[in-house]
């Protein structure tokens, strides 16, 4: 059986197809919804990674001819690579004198068991932090940076002096020790 389509029937089929775009345009009302994307970044500081080892090795401290503290003592700087704070920060430097670890009694007359020095930490602020182990106050030991920052902190030691005076000799001891501490923290 064969079905034939009359011109009226064909128009009835085509007319709805022709109206589809008009119907779609009539339904263009939209609804928009916004979604907030949020997160947080805490205020934090990290001291970075130490390049090399964490020891300032000065070797023999005295001139073996005179027994007095060597005047040419030096040690390579240490670097804290990639230190950062995500906000305003404080760098605090502290140090302890080098003292004889085995000889703990009071040194006899003419001798000392202490070597003082100055520690510095530079690169974090325009003025390096410094700490003198012989000083009663170290106001330059704390430095404040007003902005977030990332960079290297270079730590060094120098200006060595015998505790009690340069005319004193150091008591024999295979282990003189001091400590330098760098603290990086979020500022109040």
For each predicted feature, which ranges?
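N-terminal small/polar-rich segments of proteins
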Residues: 25-116, 141-188
């Amino acid at each position: 059986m064969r079905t034939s389509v009359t011109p009226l029937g064909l128009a009835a089929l085509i007319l709805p197809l022709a109206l589809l775009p008009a119907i779609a345009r009539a339904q263009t009302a939209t609804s928009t919804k916004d979604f907030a994307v949020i997160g947080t970044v805490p205020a934090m500081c990290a001291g970075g990674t130490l390049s090399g080892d964490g020891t300032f090795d000065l070797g023999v401290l005295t001139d073996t001819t005179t027994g007095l503290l060597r005047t040419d003592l030096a040690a390579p700087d240490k670097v804290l690579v990639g230190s950062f704070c995500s906000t305003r920060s404080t760098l605090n430097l502290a140090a302890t004198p080098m003292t004889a670890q085995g000889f703990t009694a009071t040194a006899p007359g003419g001798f000392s068991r202490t070597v003082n020095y100055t520690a510095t930490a530079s690169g974090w602020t325009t003025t390096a932090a410094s700490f003198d182990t012989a000083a009663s106050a170290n106001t330059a030991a704390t430095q404040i940076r007003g902005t977030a920052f990332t960079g290297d902190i270079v730590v060094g030691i120098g200006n060595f002096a015998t505790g009690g005076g340069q005319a004193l000799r150091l008591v024999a001891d295979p282990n003189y020790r001091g400590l330098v501490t760098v603290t990086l923290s979020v500022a109040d």
